[in-house]
Amino acid sequence: MDGQHMVRGQLALRAMGVQGIPVVNVENACASASTALHMAVQHVRSGAADIVLAVGAEKMCIDDKARMFAAFDGAWDVHDTEAGKERLLAMGHGIAPPPGSQSLRPYSLFMDVYAAMGCMHMREFGTTQQQFAAVAAKNHGHSAHNPLAQYREAISVEQVLAAPPISYPLTLPMCSPVSDGAAAAIVCNESGLKCLQGDARRAVRVLACVLQTGSERASNDLENHLVRKAAHRLYEQSGV
């Protein structure tokens, strides 16, 4: 949010003494951190390094809400914005939002996109708003046990449904909050693990890690959905 776009990693890590090694800054929308992890895995598997640190960080909380939400404007084709929005929102056609189910306060347009995806799921599979609420309640239930979670209060399905509406079928607890936070993963081979004096019993083995982008398709053509395609590649590589 402060315009530090080009050398974030170099500047953030230098104060901790991390310098003189390759640092790659990754921007890939909501997949930025997982893309960094994918690159780390490939780097180690190629033999280019024994140890790679993959860091995901986000800094979104500022007082200027308009500027904060404007940060998402570059997450689609800025030269064809309206057509892109229209195409995405069309996924929800056929499901009429009940009266009072849309927020009158400003929020990210991506909530409308996710709501359209939810409406498409309702139309195609008979999914209910209560089932979406059950997912949110389950996730908030898990966060109550995580001391590092942004929100740590358990919430019932009924409370999720009674919460302020955002964009039907989504209510506030179903939506991603604006956050400041970070996470990191150390990716290494056996030599790297020994160098770090790590406990092999705690190490998580990466069987497969794939990265895939979407392709032109009808919104209800789920056979060619990028998640399905990526999952099949993942299962093939991992032998699961």
What are the residue ranges of the model-derived segments?
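Active-site-proximal alpha-helical scaffold in enzymes
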Residues: 28-58, 111-145, 185-191
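Phosphate/pyrophosphate-binding loops at sites that engage ATP/ADP/AMP, CoA/4′-phosphopantetheine
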Residues: 121-126, 230-240
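ATPase catalytic-site recognition across NTP-hydrolyzing enzymes
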Residues: 139-140, 144-152, 158
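Short acidic, glycine/serine/threonine-rich loops at helix termini
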Residues: 63-69, 144-147, 198, 217-219
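Condensing-enzyme catalytic core mediating Claisen C-C bond formation in acyl metabolism
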Residues: 86-104, 134, 165-233, 237
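Generic structural marker for isolated residues within well-ordered, non-membrane alpha-helices
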Residues: 9, 118, 231
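Conserved catalytic cysteine-centered active-site region
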Residues: 2-51, 59-114, 151-177, 207-209, ...
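Beta-strand segments within the central parallel beta-sheet cores of soluble alpha/beta enzyme folds
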Residues: 1, 22-28, 52-56, 130-137, ...
